[in-house]
From Swiss-Prot:
Reported modifications of this chain: Ubiquitinated by COP1 in darkness; this leads to proteasomal degradation.
Protein name (record): Protein PHOTOPERIODIC CONTROL OF HYPOCOTYL 1
Self-association and partners: Interacts with light-activated phyB. Binds directly to PIF1 and COP1.
Biased composition (Low complexity): 230-247
Keywords assigned by UniProt, alphabetized: Nucleus, Ubl conjugation
Stored SMART domains: FBOX
Pfam families assigned: Beta-prop_KIB1-4, F-box
Protein induction: Induced by far-red (FR) and blue (B) lights, as well as transiently following transition from darkness to red light (R) in a phyB-independent manner; responses to red and far-red lights depend on phyA, and responses to blue light rely on both phyA and cryptochromes. In the dark, binds to COP1 and undergo degradation through the 26S proteasome pathway.
Annotated organism of origin: Arabidopsis thaliana
One record GO biological process: circadian rhythm
Cellular component aspect of the GO annotation: nucleus
Disordered: annotated span: 74-95, 186-283, 316-335
Length: 778
């Protein structure tokens, strides 16, 4: 289908160009490419056939989009290009005359132009609205006309445009192409304009009935004002897209923005494909329903976008689109009887020129303006910008019906909110478990505590403890919790919860040993370990044993050690609990360096010892004590916690130097000698197990004794081997008590064998024990 496109020349004279439209436009624009009826325009040398369009000629029952756009085309019967001199006839309506004053290129002018050379419209109602009601809009185009204007004016009109056209001293214009019906058998006294969408292909199937719907017999002014030519101007990537109009293409739906847009091959940017002439204007039409959908969503098709970046496009909401959508909604609310209706097409062109802002540059400017002015357009930005601006908005990228509010907290409020650590919760659970039962009551997620056992000035006080209220605990309660902490590591974790807890608990100093819980125990008058009466006191201490992981140049290593703090404030001592002579880590070749804050330290076990002071000879002369002085003595003891109502009853068993056992009961607050060894052997090791004390002597024959709290002593049958062991120890493993023996063969001092007697021994050990006659002790 060939057609003539009327373009404005330098002298405002119509210049026609022969052109043919090639079928290479995308599929979603195909429904507008069907050939319709065309009206013939002729110059003064030829006659013009004219037909009027009347509302009663409409065909009802066919569904047509309510807002098709329109275009006017000019068809020449001859191949000769002729310059047309436009003129204006006097019998045109007043409203049309006003239109001609603003848009002279739409009406022919000249003295030689007769009444047959113009379009006759009904003049009984001389209003622009009635005039447009008689015209069925088909399509609208926007072109660039070669009109010479002052450069300063054109610069203001085209400021910020990035359309790939030559815009030097030119202004955007427009032309209308009317497609009159070629089937004259159905026309009634005039030319019928039909929609390109509802028309059929007349070249293949012959004359057919025009199926245009009666729903578009009128063109509403308020909806026509909402047309923005910014969406019709093509970018540099879509410049020169043609129209495929040779076959009837069924109506297609608007492509979903979440799906990959169809790829459109690039063609030559030419208007006349036969001549190969390159046009200086990019022409592209767009369906109005893309802009006037019910939810006013802008659908933007960019065929060159890769599939991997589709989610990026969904996140990139251009503020220019939101501003255009808002302007469309505001213009739709305009009244039908406003005075600006006469300036309809000029307003459309003006709005199209103003909206021709580059999409790749405007978001930066508009975002900065919105941030400075604090406008409502900030609600259309991304959620991360909303959080950055600290403003409660609703994201426009979310589906309909879902709202997301962003109300970030201030930095000071965030710092005030304390979040408890696992160590804090563990300490609280351990401390609260040691309180009196009548003072605790658990209610759902709250722990209610009645502080009746504290010396408060008021009788009762209740505190609701929740996970987020650690800093709100009173100092009296913190001191009570502090009393249930047993090791210095627990104190360290306690102080690391929050600042209010650190202010209540003082830091550890040199007066307290690391990981020690002390008890002041008084000796009986008339009894001492050396057999002499004394009134001195001894101190019971708990020595924890830790498994320390530290880094070495050869990799990670582990160390089993007990920790002590020196009195003079020097670094802590690491002692080996398995060494009889007390090897000190940190001296000589055994020096170990590690950070107690970053190195993993796992509680492994503990043992107890007592410390007392007594006079001992410091110098001897001729085998006799010459000088005595007070010496601090430390002895290892075994501690047994007893079950009682107040949970404060305990017992301590001590193996004296006089081959006897001495027991201390907290209920009696006195030391009692249990029994002397029948064979005068000293006791080598002690252990508390299942409410009783167990002791093994130094004979090396595996002689184990059970000591009851009633001071009764019972010997377990011998589990000794064929030879004497060099060292024996009692070890608790879960619910069992094991006897460990270490043997040193004669003549081979450094070769040692260890036997473990118990129900969970290795098969090899069990076999050797059966052969040697060993018995298992449980």
């Amino acid at each position: 289908m060939s057609e003539h496109v009327m373009v404005l020349g330098k002298g405002n004279k119509g210049i026609s160009k022969n052109s043919s439209v090639n079928p290479y436009e995308s599929a979603w624009l195909g429904r507008w490419t069907q050939s319709g009826s065309e009206v013939k325009f002729h110059d003064g040398e030829t006659n013009c056939s004219k037909q009027l369009i009347r509302p009663e000629d409409e065909n009802h029952g066919v569904e047509v989009l309510p807002f098709p756009m329109f275009k006017v085309s000019q068809k020449r019967e001859t191949t000769t290009t002729t310059t047309t001199k436009p003129s204006f006839h006097e019998d045109v309506g007043s409203s049309s005359r006003a239109m001609v004053n603003r848009m002279p290129w739409m009406y022919p002018q000249g003295e030689n132009f007769s009444s047959s050379n113009r379009l006759d419209f009904p003049i009984q109602e001389k209003t622009t609205q009635n005039l447009l009601e008689l015209i069925r809009p088909v399509r609208i185009y926007a072109t660039v006309d070669s009109v010479n204007l002052p450069k300063e004016d054109s610069h203001q009109l085209l400021k910020g445009s990035t359309v790939s056209m030559k815009l030097k001293g030119k202004i955007f214009g427009g032309y209308l192409d009317l497609f009159p019906n070629q089937d004259h058998s159905h026309n009634r006294g005039g030319v019928r304009l039909q929609s390109l969408e509802s028309s059929k292909d007349t070249q293949e199937d012959g004359p057919r009935k025009n199926e245009s719907s009666a729903e578009t017999n009128t063109l509403e002014m308020d909806r026509l004002q909402t047309i923005h030519l910014s969406g019709s101007i093509s970018s540099s990537s879509t410049k020169g897209k043609g129209i495929k109009g040779y076959s009837a293409i069924p109506r297609t739906e608007i492509p979903d923005m979440n799906e990959e847009p169809p790829l459109v091959p690039d063609r030559e940017n030419s208007v006349d494909g036969h001549q190969g002439e390159t046009s200086n204007s990019a022409t592209q039409s767009m369906n109005v329903e893309h802009f006037l959908s019910r939810d006013c969503k802008r659908v933007r098709l960019e065929p060159e976008v890769e599939a991997s970046s589709r989610w990026v496009k969904r996140l990139k909401t251009s503020p220019s689109d939101s501003s255009e959508t808002k302007s469309m909604m505001k213009m739709k609310e305009a009244s039908l009887g406003e005075k600006e209706n006469n300036n309809l097409f000029l307003e459309i062109l003006k709005s199209g020129i103003n909206n021709l802002q580059p999409r790749n540059q405007e978001p930066v400017v508009s975002q900065s303006n919105d941030l400075r002015q604090g406008g409502d357009d900030i609600t259309l930005l991304h959620p991360w910008i909303q959080r950055w601006c600290k403003k409660k908005t609703t994201s426009t990228d979310q589906p309909t019906g879902q709202e997301a509010s962003f109300e970030p907290e201030s930095h000071k409020e965030f710092e005030k909110k304390q979040y408890p650590s696992i160590a804090a919760m563990a300490l609280m659970g351990k401390a609260l478990s040691g309180l009196n039962p009548y003072g605790l009551r658990k209610t759902n997620s709250l722990m209610v505590w009645n502080a009746r056992d504290l010396s408060f000035t008021y009788r009762s006080l209740r505190w609701n403890l929740t996970m987020a209220d650690w800093p709100l605990l009173p100092n009296d309660l913190l001191e009570l919790i502090m009393g249930h902490l047993e090791t210095s590591f627990e104190i360290f974790l306690f102080r690391s919860v929050c600042s209010s807890w650190r202010s209540v608990v003082p830091p550890l100093d040199h007066s307290r040993c690391l990981g020690i819980k002390t008890h002041d125990i008084s000796f009986n008058v008339g009894f001492s370990f050396n057999g002499r009466p004394t009134n001195e006191y001894c101190t019971l201490k708990k020595i924890p044993i830790y498994l320390v992981k530290f880094w070495t140049p050869f990799g990670d290593d582990y160390l089993l050690a007990e920790m002590r703090e020196r009195n003079d404030g020097e670094p802590k001592l690491l002692l080996s609990p398995l060494s009889s002579n007390g090897i000190k880590y940190g001296m000589g070749i055994n020096k170990v360096l590690f950070n107690s804050l970053t190195s993993p330290i796992i509680p492994f076990g503990q043992y107890y010892e007592i410390t007392y002071i007594e006079k001992r000879p410091s110098e001897y002369r001729f085998g006799f004590p010459y000088k005595l002085e007070w010496v601090e003595i430390t002895e290892r003891v075994e501690f047994l916690k007893l079950d009682s109502e107040d949970s404060r009853d305990f017992a301590v068993l001590f193996a004296g130097r006089m081959c006897n056992l001495v027991m201390y009961r907290s209920r009696n607050m006195s030391w009692t000698q249990v029994v002397e060894h029948p064979e005068k052997y000293a006791y080598q090791d002690l252990v508390a197990f299942k409410g009783k004390f167990y002791a093994v002597d130094s004979s090396g024959r595996g002689r184990v004794f059970v000591v009851e709290l009633s001071f009764e002593v019972t010997e377990i049958p011998s589990v000794g081997g064929s030879q004497q062991s060099s060292k024996e120890s009692l070890v608790q493993s879960g619910e069992e008590l094991l006897l460990v023996q270490r043997f040193t063969p004669v003549g081979r001092r450094y070769d040692e064998y260890i036997y473990i007697h118990g129900s969970e021994c290795l098969d090899l050990m069990k076999k050797e024990e059966r052969e040697s006659g060993f018995k298992l002790m449980t």
